[in-house]
Design a protein with these regions (language model features):
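N-terminal intrinsically disordered, low-complexity tails enriched in polar/charged
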Residues: 1-25
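Short coil/turn connectors between adjacent alpha-helices in alpha-solenoid helical repeat scaffolds
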Residues: 1-7, 36-54, 85-98, 128-131
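Amphipathic alpha-helical repeat scaffolds of TPR domains
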Residues: 9, 21-43, 60, 68-90, ...
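Alpha-helical repeat scaffolds
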Residues: 9-18, 49-65, 93-108, 131-140, ...
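Boundary/linker segments of alpha-helical solenoid repeat arrays
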Residues: 64, 68-73, 109-116, 143-153
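TPR/TPR-like alpha-solenoid helical repeat scaffolds
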Residues: 72-86, 147-168
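Sterile Alpha Motif
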Residues: 111-144
């Protein structure tokens, strides 16, 4: 087991103990993120699915459990939840996980968050919805926080990189 894995597992134990005495949306975010990290470094599909399921439960519960939660924290929880579902999609190739990602993030587009737009484009391209991919990428590229390197290197966007409109959409 690598040092990083040991550190993550140790921190999971610590945060799970904190959950018993002092739960908060921030703690749920950390607990979910730790499980997402384990899912991404695991080489076992069964382990990945287990950690993703745990992360999803923690993040979804935190989104609905608290009456008063700052919008920025709600967006972070939602983005982590969307990431978990898209990792699920990458493992299973089941389009329903991309659809769930869209359902989670669409209501948050009012915030004009680059990461929300990116994940919506990622979910759309995963479902082969090229018009919606173009729409969300257009919004993403208009935000100051867009990352061209990420867009160019992400394998999910390979099908649209060759599209006639793609180079025109990129900022000069």
């Amino acid at each position: 087991m690598s040092v990083n894995t040991t550190t993550i597992i140790s921190r999971i134990g610590e945060t799970d103990q904190l959950y018993l005495t002092n739960n908060s949306p921030e703690l749920a975010l950390e607990r979910g993120d730790l499980r997402l990290e384990l899912a991404t470094i695991s080489h076992s599909k069964q382990e990945q699915i287990h950690f993703l399921q745990e992360a999803i439960v923690l993040l979804e519960t935190a989104r609905v459990e608290y009456e008063e939660i700052p919008m920025t924290l709600y967006v972070k929880l939602s983005l982590h939840l969307a990431k978990a579902y898209m990792v699920f999609f990458e493992i299973t190739k089941e389009a329903r996980y991309a659809l769930i990602t869209q359902q989670i993030l669409r209501p948050l587009t009012i915030n004009e968050n680059a990461d929300v737009y990116f994940f919506l484009a990622y979910a759309a391209v995963s479902k082969n919805e090229l018009a919606m991919t173009r729409y969300w990428l257009g919004k993403y590229l208009k935000t100051p926080a867009h990352d061209l390197d990420l867009l160019q290197s992400h394998s999910a966007f390979r099908p649209v990189r060759d599209a006639e409109w793609f180079p025109k959409a990129l900022p000069s």
